[in-house]
Amino acid sequence: MTTTTELQSLQRLLTWASPAFPVGSFAYSAGLETAIADRRVKDAATARDWIEGNLLAGAARNDAILMAEACRAYLDEQRLQQLTDLCLALTPALERHQELAATGEAFVLAARAWAAQTCGRLPSPCPYPVAFGALAGACGISPEAMLLAYLTAYVQAQISVAIRLVPVGQTQGLTILAALEPLVAEKAKELSRATLDDLGSVAYAADIAAMAHETLSTRIFRS
């Protein structure tokens, strides 16, 4: 494991979690586009509720747990394969399965500049949570810091979807981001210590929206 200072960790996390990092995350909505089309999400209040629900009991929570496990198991190829299989098996919709696999593979390819050896022993396809977690572990980044960056990026991405599809304006989006900061920090700390026994989801509306997305007559996003 590479010894990494806090500032180095911050610098790397800012890079890896940036929308500019070439994983294509801007092309996916994780079912939010369906919720907007169905008018479940129609303004800033409902957008915040949707995002918060996924942080508390949805796919974002499970992805964070799997990411923390991968961070701790970055040297264990068998464990990483098990986490990969579990991550993909827990995905309720085809498009979400494709999203995790595609963004994960893109992340592995882009991240070789930091940890080529770790990237070389990851499963293929490697879903995004496992790829991000393993790379963070290999670079000596703590699970809590990693999850703070990941969950912040998740919230930002969901807000960006809502802004592009009009229900939320830019100022409202920033208000949501600021309001969710305490919850993101709380979940990063809590889930950094979580194990596979803590996996679970009751965000049924989000799962159904992800499944229904492929049948939308007009789609901007790939999930």
Curated annotation (Swiss-Prot):
Subcellular location: Cytoplasm
Gene Ontology MF annotations: nickel cation binding
Entry similarity comment: Belongs to the UreF family.
Annotated PANTHER family: UREASE ACCESSORY PROTEIN F
Protein name: Urease accessory protein UreF
InterPro entries: UreF, UreF_sf
Function of the molecule: Required for maturation of urease via the functional incorporation of the urease nickel metallocenter.
Annotated GO CC locations: cytoplasm
UniProt keywords, alphabetically: Chaperone, Cytoplasm, Nickel insertion
Record note on quaternary structure: UreD, UreF and UreG form a complex that acts as a GTP-hydrolysis-dependent molecular chaperone, activating the urease apoprotein by helping to assemble the nickel containing metallocenter of UreC. The UreE protein probably delivers the nickel.
Top-level lineage group: Bacteria
